Amino acid sequence: MDRGVLPQAIALLLAVCSFGPTAGLAEGVQCDLQPVDPKVTYTTSQVSEGCVAHVPNATVGVHILFLEFSKEVSTLELTVQMTNPNGARPQEVLLILSVNKNIHLTLQVPEIPLHLAYDSKLVFLQEAPKAVITELPPSTTKNQLFLWANTKGSIISAAELDNPQSILLRLDQAPTSPSRCTLEPRKDMGHTLEWKSHTQASVLGCHLEGVTGHKEAHILRVLPGSEAWPRTVTVEVELSCALRDPEAVLILQGPPYVSWLIDANHNVKAWTTGEYSFKIFPGSNIQGVNLPDTRQGLLEEARKLNASVIASFVELPLASVISLQDRSCGSGLQPSPTTVQITPPGEGCNQDLLLSLIQPRCSDDVMTLVLRKDLISTLGCTITSLTFWDPSCQAEDTDDKFVLRGTYSSCGMKVAENVVISNEVVVNLLSSSSPQRKQVQCINLDSLSFQLGLYLSPHFLQASNTIELGQQGFVQVSMSPSIPELMTQLDSCQLNLGPDVEMVDLIQNQEAKSSCVSLLSPSPGGDMRFSFLLRGYVVPMPTAGILSCTVALRPRTWSLDVHKTASTRLNIVSPGLPDKGLVLPAVLGITFGAFLIGALLTAALWYIHSHTRHPGKREPVVAVAAPASSESSSTNHSIGSTQSTPCSTSSMA
């Protein structure tokens, strides 16, 4: 047998054996629990307040995260998943982030039409996601935000989290959930949301008086959740023993509907409620025992198992994964003298977060960046100087912030077409002998102009402001001036037909919304192009509309997008109406039709003349009834009908 498997097999055999009570133990347990070194983290779906709804026919599914942080600056990893890509889901997803402090956000999202709403003054994105960004309304309470979210779509989930470190949000809807999302205290979000907290669990330990030996006990008590349904809790145990290999007992107590999957790198004896199994033998379920559900009772249980040390005692909310790390491993209980955390000298200044706060803005021929001193202090940093590449351009030191600014013609600025402005920011820190440098860029949108034109042919020769129902339109968006350092892409395009008609989405998240829309190759000059087919049942009546497109602008050495919108007004008419001027094909058609009618009329007159006889030689004429109206009704019925097209507009209607 493999050496790595042998200890686990021995642990499994030992776990099956019964632990009999030790004779001669005193009735009371003398144990003074104190904070100790072992580290316990956990992932849970329990939130302080939340709700989950099932809205199968929602066009826009809204998910809200109310995030409360204790520090002025925190980091957050947010992962959005779609477990079943082929399952029922809204056409669009709106994710709302409401935060009370500054956060540095790392976001991972699937390839879906996603809208993201947050306060840009508090949320700093590590890199731009493929999402449409919306600014949250200012000074919004929880109730006001709920009302605002209801105007955007159907609320699928909402949750309030305290000090989250990482969040996993699954967009798959739970069929058993109610049809309306109503916030409930101590909500179990189930499969919809799991999260891990920045705040570590409180770990306590003690010596058990009157017990000799070196056996140590790790007690994990999982508290009941708001909903009782069968679930498995994975317990990861990592014991790093440098001096010796002590005996370890793992006591797991939880609600009766919880089973355990133990993944340990060390020989442990398991003593649990419910069923449990080891990861190396996942199919071998072992029946547990009845354990007391009080702290004193669990300490007594550890003493019965001859444990002389409670190496860790933790009470946790209902979790899906619990991770226990103990590096002292029975080498003697070392209670922490105080719960105050001392920051190691090498970790005093979080330089990565500090550099992420440097976000310049360009306007009125000036690049400006502002660093708040309270954020700098929270990161443990002390700035001695802040300059551009040209050290003579130093930041202004005010009471509450550093302000660094420079005109486009000074401080070593590099300017491309008066639009893309770049420089280098140099930060000198008290804790570092070498300066920190960051390349910065911003876009002067005031110097850019965009033109959006509609054409009725793929040659893009003559722009038009009128289009017929059922006609294919070709759109070109051009930017002036054209700048090689600036990448452009159509982020979204919509056709607004007024307040009484639903918006027609053509492009979303830089992708065609349906098969009626085609993204075309750029023009030789780099102009963005696409085509769309305007179906009759998309636009219910001849009307006027506004075609608008949002362009994503990004310098080639920058990770964030800047957006600019261009629009034009369209007249939408029914086929055959004289709302459009005559173009060359129409003139040629009318000329040919007139010629054909004249030729047929001449031939008819010649035929009548050649067959006319003397009145006396004419034969009697027999009156014949007119043809039934059904012959002409079929022709009249087809007037005004439109031919169906193969493209699907299910996502546009």
From Swiss-Prot:
Region Disordered, as annotated, extends over: 625-653
Q: Which residues lie on this side of the membrane: Cytoplasmic?
A: 607-653
Q: Where is this region: OR1, C-terminal part?
A: 199-329
Region (OR2): which ranges? 45-198
The record's PANTHER family line, in alphabetical order, gives:
ENDOGLIN, ENDOGLIN/TGF-BETA RECEPTOR TYPE III
Its signal peptide is: 1-24
For this protein, the record's InterPro entries field holds: ZP-N
Provide the positions where the record notes the PTM Phosphoserine.
S641, S644
Q: Which UniProt keywords apply?
A: Angiogenesis, Cell adhesion, Cell membrane, Disulfide bond, Glycoprotein, Membrane, Phosphoprotein, Signal, Transmembrane, Transmembrane helix
Q: Where is this region: Essential for interaction with GDF2?
A: 269-281
Question: Which residues lie within the region annotated OR1, N-terminal part?
Answer: 27-44
What more does the record tell us?
Lacks a RGD motif, contrary to the human protein.
The biological processes this protein is annotated with in GO are: angiogenesis; cell adhesion; transforming growth factor beta receptor signaling pathway; vasculogenesis
Name recorded for this polypeptide = Endoglin
- The portions of this protein that span the membrane are 582-606
